[in-house]
Amino acid sequence: MEWRNIILRISVVVTTYNGKMHLEKQLLSLLQQERAPDEVLIFDDGSTDGTIELVQSFIRKNCLESWQFYVNAKRKGWKQNFMEGLRKAAGDILFPCDQDDIWYPKKLAEMTAVMEQHPEIKLLACDYRVLYEPGAIKATVYKKTPAETQGLITRYGFTK
């Protein structure tokens, strides 16, 4: 697909399992993106801690028509849960998101701009920070080498 001069559709795929403690901050960070995603797909793997009710309430309270929420009748495990979400996503660019991620407001805008300017890119990752509970920075992780990236792709099952 030639991406130049078109607006790419963005899909965010979130998976949850008993993540109520961190989830509201994460959902707010998605809602506050400078470049709103075209769709947010949330897949819950049978939570029992109030996660399901939190997500349903958040979507309803914020009138998020482009957000879809799925609850597995039977547990699938995190990898299958993510893979199902990625398969259902309709966007040109897919952003997987863990339930405890908090995204900077410019994440989608900046990463999408890079993809639009460089259509040859198939996989783009960004730096991240690991935070302690109160928000103090535990570690900042910078650019991975191609070998590390390939290892991550293979280990987490994003290839056949």
Where in the sequence are the language-model features?
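Nucleotide-sugar donor-binding/catalytic module of glycosyltransferases
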Residues: 2-160
